[in-house]
Amino acid sequence: LCDYKNQTLTEELMGTGIIVCGLNGSGKSTLGKALAKKLHFHFIDNEDLYFPKTDPDYIYASPRTRKEVEKLLWSEIRAHENFVFTSVKGDYGETIYPFFQYAVLIGVPRDIRLQRVRNRSFQKFGERMQIGGDLYEQEEKFFDFVKSRPENAVEEWVQSLKCPILRIDGTKPVEENINYIMEQIQN
């Protein structure tokens, strides 16, 4: 029995929750969306919870607070018993951990991850994120944040989970990784 602010959830209500985690640029969202589609599970992306996309010119404007995100995440989990959740870490308190039946930890070399993050930014914002662009400073601060994250941060966090941890190589094709995950969760 798990009580979260007068919202009682019992194990009988739990379906299958899978957290896909890894550092920025590891391919969490891409893999998570594809995995959710393959399993016919609900997809929850931490980035979507944090950023309500109220400003069409800059999707990262007006981020929600961690408390708001936690409340939204609980709402999503209650509404969808089978889900794939993507996040760098799912560290929203130990009360959520029992809802993860599997954790998928994506590993990608740092240089590849950092390049992916820059490429993604350019795909979203184009010249606006380049020198002289109106988003240059904001995006550079984000890149510095991504670079500053300890390489072992997610590995250390995932050790606190009680579910099986599936480690995958995020440089491999998405379909290959999905096939591996499917084999592991069906056994």
What is the role of each PLM region?
Residues 15-17, 81:
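Pre-Walker A (Motif I) flank of P-loop NTPase domains
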Residues 20:
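Hydrophobic anchor at the beta1->P-loop junction of P-loop NTPases
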Residues 23:
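P-loop (Walker A) phosphate-binding loop of NTP-binding proteins
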Residues 26:
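ATP-binding Walker
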Residues 29:
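Walker A/P-loop
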Residues 33, 37-75:
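Conserved substrate/cofactor phosphate-moiety recognition/catalytic segment
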Residues 99-120:
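Conserved phosphate-donor/acceptor-positioning beta-strand/loop module used by diverse small-molecule
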Residues 126-177:
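Small-molecule kinase domains that catalyze NTP-dependent phosphoryl transfer to phosphate-bearing small molecules
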